[in-house]
Every structure is written in C-alpha cells, then in structure tokens.
C-alpha cells in the first residue's frame, strides 16, 4: 500500500470496509451539494483550478522516508467555494485512474480527507476575507491553505489509526510530515 511516492492518497485494500463505507457516506452527500451549486458561468475557472490541482500533485517534496505533494484544495475552496469539492473530486478520480494515486474503492475516503476540508475551509475563508482589509487577505489565504492541509492530515491519521493499530506509527509519521507542507 505504500509505494514510497505518496501517502496523502490512501490506496485500495488498506482500509477496512467499514471505514471505506463511512468515507462514501460522507463524500456522496457533500458531492451532491457541490454539484448542485456548480455555476455554468464558472466552467473556465473550474477547468483552470482543476488543472492546477492535478499539476500541483505532481510536485513532490521529500519528507523523511516518503514524499508529499501540493494539495491546493484550500486555495481551490477559496476560489470556488463548494464547487471546489467537485473539481478536487475530478482531480482525485483522474489521479487514481491515470497515475495510480489512491484507488476507486477508497475514493470516498480520499474525497472526505482532501476535498471536503478544502471546500469547507474555503467557504470559511471566503466569508472571512470579506471582513478584513486587502492587506490581510494574503494571510487569510495562507491560513486557509495551511489549515486545510493540517485538517486533512488529522483526518488521514484518524482514518489510518482506526483501520489498524499497526498503522498508527505510519499515521503519526504522515501527520508530522504534513506540518512542513502546511507551513
């Protein structure tokens, strides 16, 4: 399950069926909300942000015995609101199908870990950014992007740890490895 390349994406066969089911139970309603809120006048923006998300995932940063990659779901959330959940889901699906990051059965878990926090944090940031001066807006973007990574890392830790206690040391290492990415 660990290819040495990437640990933010969970691969097929790693998680218990219960955890996979919970992931889908969270992801599907959230994705339904996101799809309903898509706007046709934003199609170009969706494409650009989706391409940036996909391309960002190819930029790997070595952290100890593994490597991490840019996720960009928090920034996508700032730009697209709930629409970010859909475009990140498309990116995750393409990554699973084309380059083997993640898997199809665990796509719901990966959506719940990576896409959903980005959409939620992005919505919070979109509201917050309207309340502050333009000078402070870059700080909010940084906080939202970094906060999204930390939330995703916590969710990944919980997901791995609840599947099998033998995965706890790996889960801890993955969580700690995400801290520099968040910063």
Stretch-by-stretch model annotation:
Residues 76-83:
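Alpha-helix C-terminal capping segments
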Residues 17-21, 43-48, 85-89, 107-112, ...:
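Hydrophobic alpha-helical transmembrane segments
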Residues 111-157:
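Short helix-perturbing small/polar motifs within transmembrane alpha-helices
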Residues 140-150, 167-183:
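C-terminal transmembrane helix-loop-helix hairpin of multi-pass membrane proteins
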Residues 20-32, 52-56, 119-122, 145-157, ...:
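Hydrophobic core segments of alpha-helical transmembrane domains in multi-pass membrane transport
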Residues 50-54, 84-96:
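Small-polar-interrupted transmembrane alpha-helices in polytopic inner-membrane proteins
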Residues 1-75:
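Hydrophobic transmembrane alpha-helices
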Residues 58-67, 90-121:
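Interfacial aromatic-anchored transmembrane helix boundaries in multi-pass membrane proteins
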């Amino acid at each position: 399950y660990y290819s040495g390349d990437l640990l933010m994406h969970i691969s097929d066969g790693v998680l218990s069926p219960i955890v996979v089911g919970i992931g889908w139970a969270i992801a599907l309603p959230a994705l339904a909300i996101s799809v309903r809120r898509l706007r046709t006048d934003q199609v170009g923006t969706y494409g650009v942000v989706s391409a940036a998300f996909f391309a960002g995932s190819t930029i790997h940063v070595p952290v100890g015995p593994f490597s991490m990659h840019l996720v960009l779901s928090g920034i996508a959330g700032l730009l697209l609101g709930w629409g970010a959940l859909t475009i990140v889901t498309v990116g995750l699906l393409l990554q699973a199908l084309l380059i083997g990051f993640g898997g199809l059965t665990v796509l719901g878990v990966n959506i719940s870990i990576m896409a959903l926090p980005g959409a939620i944090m992005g919505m919070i940031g979109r509201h917050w950014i309207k309340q502050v001066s333009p000078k402070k807006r870059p700080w909010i973007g940084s906080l939202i992007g970094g906060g999204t990574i930390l939330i995703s890392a916590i969710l990944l830790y919980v997901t791995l740890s609840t599947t099998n206690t033998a995965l706890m040391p790996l889960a801890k290492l993955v969580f700690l490895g995400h801290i520099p990415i968040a910063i």
